[in-house]
A protein has these predicted regions:
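Extracellular ligand-binding/catalytic regions of CAZymes and related secreted enzymes
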Residues: 1-111
């Protein structure tokens, strides 16, 4: 089974528009050589084998002023990590907890 972070990863970064009150639930680190930042951040060519702490996938959560909330998986590969072991794994459990809270009628409150 693959991991929850693969190609097309996104990270929490207030300088790029992430809400300052967002909670980073988990992060992937130490990706394989050749992984890149988001395309919007690549302004020139250069070596891609230099360690870069900004190459990561962040699972984030934040509340909105209207009583809603946002969960961002941080990677297109997240969905592929749900089914291993018959959905009996940490990613499936985390996702289930998030979905149960999202269908709850109680509004979220801003911190």
């Amino acid at each position: 089974a693959g991991g929850a972070a693969g190609e097309e990863i996104d990270r929490y970064d207030p300088l790029l528009g992430s809400p300052s009150h967002a909670l980073v639930i988990a992060s992937s680190r130490e990706h394989r050589p050749g992984m890149l930042r988001t395309i919007e951040e690549i302004h020139m060519t250069g070596p891609n084998d230099v360690p870069d702490d900004d190459i990561r996938s962040d699972l984030t959560f934040f509340e909105t002023p209207a009583g809603g909330a946002v969960f961002a998986a941080g990677s297109i590969s997240y969905a592929g990590a749900l089914s291993p072991n018959g959905y009996q794994n940490d990613i499936a459990r985390l996702t289930g907890n998030i979905l149960r809270r999202f269908i709850d009628a109680d509004p979220f409150t801003m911190p």
